[in-house]
Amino acid sequence: MNYDRIYPCDFVNGPGCRVVLFVTGCLHKCEGCYNRSTWNARNGQLFTMNTVKELASHLSKSYIQGLTLTGGDPLYPQNREEISNLVSWVKARFPEKDIWLWTGYKFEDIKQLEMLKYVDVIIDGKYEKNLPTKKLWRGSDNQRLWSNTDGVWKHD
């Protein structure tokens, strides 16, 4: 898996101050996408143990509320194994931090993924530039916010 960039403290991609990992690789190629440079899975840098150490260093700070995974698409097929390993490791190492994940896939098509038990919030659905929204943390009105409470997923 490759990644485009890491924000050590971001207030846009979820609540509070968050560490944000932008992965590369996306099949959706949404018209009007803000992160077109992340579509090609070969772009960016290789995700390595040093990347995990960098994320851990940022996540260890008390003012960090959690980790946000975006891109690209964290659930791009070639990213799934690495993302699964990452979210399980983050939950074990930093159980007090929440994990938010943005994906172009609909929740109904990914709900069977084992890794989702480690994720607290999913924003699902492709970005649709013709469906503007005022909903917090969504790029378009079709996108839904799914919350995981004790293994039960509900959307707004």
UniProtKB/Swiss-Prot annotation:
Residues annotated as transmembrane: none
Xref: Pfam families: Fer4_12, Radical_SAM
UniProt EC number: 1.97.1.-
SS bond partners: none
InterPro entries (UniProt xref): Aldolase_TIM, NrdG, Organic_radical-activating, Radical_activat_CS, rSAM
Reported function: Activation of anaerobic ribonucleoside-triphosphate reductase under anaerobic conditions by generation of an organic free radical, using S-adenosylmethionine and reduced flavodoxin as cosubstrates to produce 5'-deoxy-adenosine.
Subunit relationships: Forms a tetramer composed of two NrdD and two NrdG subunits.
Name of the protein in question: Anaerobic ribonucleoside-triphosphate reductase-activating protein
Organism: Enterobacteria phage T4
